[in-house]
Amino acid sequence: MKKVNYFGTGRRKSAVARVILTNGTGKITINTRDFEKYLPLPATRLEMIQPLELTEKREAFDVSVNVNGGGLSAQAGAIRLGIARALIESVPELRAILKKAGLLTRDARCVERKKYGLKKARRAPQFSKR
């Protein structure tokens, strides 16, 4: 059987994930490491494979991911979006299912910048009345 690659890019906070789906057996590698070793927390692993579980394609594709930037939670979110986008490229009919579950929405929340005159983004220095 001919190997067919499907690509998807996901971003979350400062993490960027480039995902390649290949017809296979369900093997997932992140930065050339097994995904169980790369993501030690079960919650982040479940978040990452959510699109595959929802569409019942867990065993249909091998997933290869190159991810950098951000922490493990942000990377899991970026991978999730990348997998969802790659799944749509492979099977366009899955778009409705993924859209309804909210897996195609880029989470735009990121760290608010620090302003001058303040200690943090919104924390003002202590005020003394006298």
Curated annotation (Swiss-Prot):
Cite the InterPro entries for this sequence: Ribosomal_Su5_D2-typ_SF (IPR020568), Ribosomal_uS9 (IPR000754), Ribosomal_uS9_bac/plastid (IPR023035), Ribosomal_uS9_CS (IPR020574), Ribsml_uS5_D2-typ_fold_subgr (IPR014721)
Family, per the entry? Belongs to the universal ribosomal protein uS9 family.
Keywords, sorted A to Z: Ribonucleoprotein, Ribosomal protein
Record bears the keyword Ribonucleoprotein: yes
Q: Which Gene3D superfamilies match?
A: 3.30.230.10
> Which species is this UniProt entry from?
Onion yellows phytoplasma (strain OY-M)
Q: Which PANTHER family match?
A: RIBOSOMAL PROTEIN S9, SMALL RIBOSOMAL SUBUNIT PROTEIN US9M
The Gene Ontology biological process annotation of the record reads: translation
- Return the protein name: Small ribosomal subunit protein uS9
Q: Annotated Gene Ontology MF terms? A: RNA binding; structural constituent of ribosome
Q: Name one GO cellular component term.
A: cytosolic small ribosomal subunit
